[in-house]
Structure formats: C-alpha cells, structure tokens
Amino acid sequence: MAILQTFSEQTISSARASDIKEPDYSVNSRPEICFFLNGIMEEKSLISLYLARDSHSAILSSILAVDPQQKLLIMDYGINETLNQIALKRGYLRCITSHNQIRIEFDCDNLQRVQFEGRHAFSADIPESLKRLQRRNFYRVTTSITNPAVCTIPLLRAADEAPVVYSLLDISCGGMALIDQPDADTLLKAGTTLEHCRIDLPGDGNLFSSIEASIQIAYVGTVILNNGNTCPRIGCEFINLPEKSRLLIQRYITKLEQQARKLETESGF
C-alpha cells in the first residue's frame, strides 16, 4: 500500500542554483527509460506523485511493474482516496524520486486505476522522457520515526512562551523538512529567515550531534499522515551552513543509511 508523505519528500531539492555541479540529463530512449524505471523498482525507491507541477501535495508510491510491450507503468495506489480521485480525474502525475542518489523526474499521462495482483494500482503510459539531475546538496534521507531529529526555533514562542520545537521529516546538507502538529495553523511562513535554530540529531539512545543553523522557509505545504491527519509540512533551506555542521549532517545521513541497510539485511530484503 502506498504511504502518504509522512516523511521524506526526496523530491524537493533545497540546493541553491550555485550548488548545481552537473547539467540536467534527459533520457529519451525507450529502452533506457525502462532500464531506469526497472532500477527504481528493484531498489524499492519511493516515488512522490505530485498532482500538479507547482503542488506540494503528493502521494508516496512505488513502482510495481514496468511493461515495455504494453507501454505501461504500474504504481502503488494511494492510501487517501480523495487524492487518488483528484489524480485520476486529472489523468496526470508529476513523478519525482531518486536512484543511486540522483534525482529522477518524469511525467505520467493517461493515469487510470487498475487491478494488479488482487489490489488497486495506478496505471500510466511509460514516459516519453525522463530527466536525471545531479545536485550536490540534493540527497535527502528520512529521519527516524521512533527517534526523530528535532529543530528548536528560539525566535518563535508557543502559548506558554517556550521555544517552538518541530520534528524533522528528512534532512540533507542543503536543507530539511519539518512537520507541525495536526491541523495546526503553523507559525512559519514562506520566505521567513530564522537564525540560531538548534537541530538535535539523535543517536543510539543519546544525542548524535547538535548544530546551530540559520534557515529560510522555502515553502509551507501539507502532509497527510497514515492515520488520515493533515499536518503542515515546512521545507527549509540552510543559509551559509558552516563546513563543520555540514560534515556532521553528512555523518548523520551515513549513519541512517547504515541503519537502513542493516534492517534490510535482517528482514531479508
């Protein structure tokens, strides 16, 4: 079953234009496109299915099958039927994922609901083109749900005058995504710059590291949790992050990747 975006939107890069080190690479060959799609499927990479190019509302899905003969791409169906119906009515999805730490973008047309292995799934035409983007700061990882990283913003105060604390959904060396309380009217607004934000990165039972950073709010969207609750999702970009802090974040990302690989090995995937 598809998981709605309760965590990483590996999809929105917080890298600045100056961070782009390699040109975009468009793939237009059908065999090569299928090769990449199969790689994404075998890697079990999550895909963000956007309802529109400028939308921050997305369903996290995955590729279930690639059928070159029928020219069809089969993807996991969403958990939220309202979003599913909007997508089916539009017949179009903007798909963003990552493969081997490279951002992949493609469009899905002729979207339909089908039955696949006894359950609902999305069917779409195999895309005519696929874009690969290599960005230095793009690669994001999902933070732990059971032991989440948190960001304390001292310049914001809750009703009890305590600094506001947000949980992180994901993090990269270029930015992070925060989540607010369900149905909250978040205090954060797009374009706002906040200084002296403390980010606590947890370890195994203790604090892995803590850094201070200035951030700019890139966007404020929404995320639908598995339980159906809607929460504000805040995309943040680091401003002039010190090299020491960047290295700490990179080590934390490496640690999370090692934990994920260990779980995959133990579970037999």
From Swiss-Prot:
UniProt family annotation: Belongs to the YcgR family.
Keyword Iron: no
Primary location class: other
Compartments in which it is found: Bacterial flagellum basal body
Domain PilZ: 134-254
GO BP annotation list: bacterial-type flagellum-dependent cell motility; regulation of bacterial-type flagellum-dependent cell motility by regulation of motor speed
Protein name: Flagellar brake protein YcgR
Subunit (UniProt): Monomer. Interacts with the flagellar basal bodies.
GO MF annotation terms: cyclic-di-GMP binding
Pfam family, one: PilZ
Keyword Nucleotide-binding: yes
Function: Acts as a flagellar brake, regulating swimming and swarming in a bis-(3'-5') cyclic diguanylic acid (c-di-GMP)-dependent manner. Binds 1 c-di-GMP dimer per subunit. Increasing levels of c-di-GMP lead to decreased motility.
Any single GO CC term annotated in Swiss-Prot or TrEMBL for this entry: bacterial-type flagellum basal body
Gene name of the record: ycgR
Source organism phylogeny: Bacteria, Pseudomonadati, Pseudomonadota, Betaproteobacteria, Nitrosomonadales
Keywords of this entry: Bacterial flagellum, c-di-GMP, Nucleotide-binding
